[in-house]
Amino acid sequence: MADYFTTFSFEISKKDADFPLEDITQLIDAYREREYDNLPTWYKDKLSINDFGEDTVEEYMNIGYKLENDFLWIYSKEYPNIDSLVSIIQSVMKHYNSKKYISFEYAFTCNKLRTDGFGGGAVFINSSEVKFFDTGNWVREQIERFENKKIEDKK
């Protein structure tokens, strides 16, 4: 039996953020612990605890962080809910009308050398949009382009 993992590790520097990093940690904690009362007031006025769905309960969110004086380090070793993390970060950025961006990469790994066990992606977040990049999708697109070109070349 193989174990599959998704891992990431990235930092958000306070000097590069135009929003309080503490709001991100507060939201991560509130959703991980399902504690609506711990959500920032501005957030409660806009969204509810259920907006991130059941996947944000502690055993599924699997996101750790460490808030230091100069930066917020966010990481996961196993099975993070990347979509919820991205939603949390973007919610904070939208609230503060951020003009900055956050980006990070993630890796899909496996404890055995399974052919379907490796890959990864990246995400780019700003207050108005989120863009994901997935290596598996990219490879499939390249194969499709190659195959289509072969068909066109035969004509």
Regions found by a protein language model. Name each.
Residues 38, 43-155:
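Charged interaction segments
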